[in-house]
Design a protein with these regions (language model features):
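Cysteine-centered iron-sulfur cluster-binding motifs in ferredoxin-type domains/subunits
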Residues: 249-268, 297-319, 496
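Basic- and aromatic-lined ligand-binding clefts that recognize polyanionic substrates
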Residues: 369-373, 476-498
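Short, flexible loop segments at boundaries between secondary-structure elements
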Residues: 75, 168-178, 238-241, 460-487
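Redox- and metal-dependent alpha/beta enzyme cores, enriched for Fe-S-associated oxidoreductases
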Residues: 164, 178, 403, 491-498
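Flexible, glycine/charged-enriched surface loops at secondary-structure junctions
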Residues: 19, 23, 195-205, 261-277, ...
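Iron-sulfur-cluster electron-transfer modules
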Residues: 1-102, 291-459
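Flexible glycine/proline-rich, aromatic-decorated loop/lid segments
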Residues: 273-294
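The feature marks the mature, well-folded catalytic cores of soluble enzymes
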Residues: 1-246
Length: 498
């Protein structure tokens, strides 16, 4: 997102002998690469999320160029036509039995489900293609602006072979991969490797800062000694500049370790259907809003995110998808692309002040110590929750109020309808203020989050917000609420996402 750094990087790479092409769109990128391949009918490539993003493999094959993936996991997926399951282990969802069947179906002979046999066969098959190819395509984990060098990491050793093809090495990466210098890039490499595999460093770190060359004979420069005659850098924008300008720059700071997926509750259920091409999970779904279009973001699971923000906790560079997801949902709503069910919920809130469209009469009670905000679920669906909470408040002999509450607005905010939330919040706060109480307790974690986080700018009353479990625990510790002695209870605690 730093224009000066980008400009510095381009200049330095060009000074080092790279040919640099800036691709505004994915079509610009694939058209340019096809032109560079020329008459060649076979290219080998390494694993690259940017090439997945621009659809390079499919585009080249459509135009008569055979493309062979040289990462074993990606090669297996190429044969099976499946989606990747993880950025560093694309075929990790497949068992050895499934991979044996894929090889058997692809090559017309039976393979034993032995990982060593399968790996050795894959290695030999890939190596044969590499030796025949004159053009290699790789991605890049980092571009170093100060040195004009591309950093590419791998464990299999395939990238060194791919980038040493005789004719051309084409590096395809994106404008968010630029680092100030090689030291910063190596820090990223160590971080990525540790969070991806638990190892302190990857097996190979390839650093390319120019073409293969020698001047050993009378200082006469000769290019293409043991490596390619040309190194070409394709810098893909494809919506990133727009994303940076709109305040989504951090969304593209991802280093590709995949650690966020391990703690994502949605990914555990939906798997590799959640996300966009090589960019899996909530971040990928959000990024596809810019890399593709708003409709793609919907298809890739923009509304799947539970907003738990486990991804931010797990991320070594502190990328959290929840806030970005909610902002993009608002853009979806403003563009008129909301789901019919979401529109119905919004209409219900407008008409009845609750998402269910329920017109049941609410119990109202005056009190000046505590306001019990029941929430729509406890008021209209799980009424036993409200009844049980009220019983405990009665036992405490506390002066509690039950206001004529309206929806907290959480469901509206989560579905991209921000405008109505402020109206609901204002109405709730006015009713709470009238009671004179300084503590508000909630049964619903979503309602509690709404009051504490989603509209703190409206909270000028110095109110204390507590979940009912927190409030009653306080009273137990104070000795005001006593549990029956000797009673054995089995308790399940559901730790909420909010």
């Amino acid at each position: 997102g730093n224009k000066e750094l980008l400009s510095q990087a381009i200049k330095k790479f060009e000074n080092n002998g790279f040919r640099v092409f800036y691709a505004d769109t994915k079509k610009d990128a694939v058209d340019f690469i096809l032109k560079e391949i020329g008459e060649e009918k076979l290219v080998v490539k390494s694993k690259s999320n940017v090439t997945k993003e621009i659809g390079l493999h499919e585009y080249l094959e459509k135009n008569g160029v055979e493309v062979i993936e040289t990462d074993l996991g990606d090669y297996i997926l190429q044969l099976s036509k499946e989606k990747p399951a993880h950025p560093t282990g694309p075929a990790c969802h497949l068992s050895r039995h499934e991979i044996a069947k894929i090889f058997s179906d692809s090559f017309g002979k039976n393979f034993e489900p032995d990982p060593l046999i399968l790996t050795k066969f894959g290695k030999e098959k890939i190596r044969g293609y590499i030796e025949k190819s004159k053009i290699g395509i790789t991605g890049a984990n980092a571009l170093c602006a100060e040195e004009g060098a591309a950093v590419i990491i791998n464990n299999e050793g395939n990238i060194n072979l791919v980038q040493m093809r005789e004719k051309k090495h084409i590096i395809v990466t994106s404008i968010d991969k630029i680092y100030p210098n090689i030291e910063e890039a190596i820090n990223m490499v160590k971080l990525c490797t540790y969070y991806a595999t638990g190892a302190p460093i990857t097996s190979y770190i390839e650093i390319t800062s120019g073409v293969s060359k020698t001047a050993d004979i009378e200082k006469m420069l000769f290019k293409g000694m043991q490596g390619p005659n040309e190194v070409i850098l394709v810098l893909v924008d494809n919506g990133r500049t727009e994303a940076f300008a709109k305040g989504y720059k951090n969304l593209f700071y991802c280093i590709g370790c995949g650690n966020c997926l391990l703690d994502c509750p949605v990914y555990h259920v939906v798997g590799n259907e959640y996300g966009y091409k090589g960019y899996l999970g909530g971040r990928g779904a959000s990024a596809s809003f810019f890399l593709e279009n708003p409709e793609a973001a919907l298809e890739n699971g923009l509304f799947f995110c539970t907003t738990c923000n486990n991804c931010e906790v797990s991320c070594p560079v502190d990328i959290g998808n929840a806030d970005y997801s909610e902002r993009l949902r608002e853009e979806i709503s403003l563009a008129g692309l909301s789901f019919p069910a979401h529109n119905q919920v919004l209409e219900n809130i407008k008409m009845t002040k609750n998402p269910f469209g329920d017109t049941s009469k609410k119990q109202i009670k005056e009190g000046n110590e505590v306001v019990y905000y029941r929430g729509c679920m406890a008021l209209y669906r799980e009424k036993n929750i409200a009844d049980s909470t009220i019983k405990l408040l009665e036992k405490l002999n506390v002066s509690y109020a039950l206001i004529d509450e309206v929806c907290c607005g959480s469901v509206a905010l989560r579905t991209g309808n921000k405008k109505i939330v402020k109206e609901l919040a204002k109405e709730n706060f006015e009713k709470i203020k009238k009671t004179g109480a300084k503590t508000v307790i909630f049964s619903c974690a979503g309602c509690l989050r709404a009051f504490m986080k989603d509209y703190p700018d409206l909270n000028d009353t110095n109110l204390e917000f507590l979940h009912s479990s927190q409030y009653f625990l306080q009273k137990i510790k104070e000795g005001k609420l006593k549990l029956k002695d000797g009673r054995k209870l089995k308790v399940t605690f559901h730790d909420p996402c909010h």
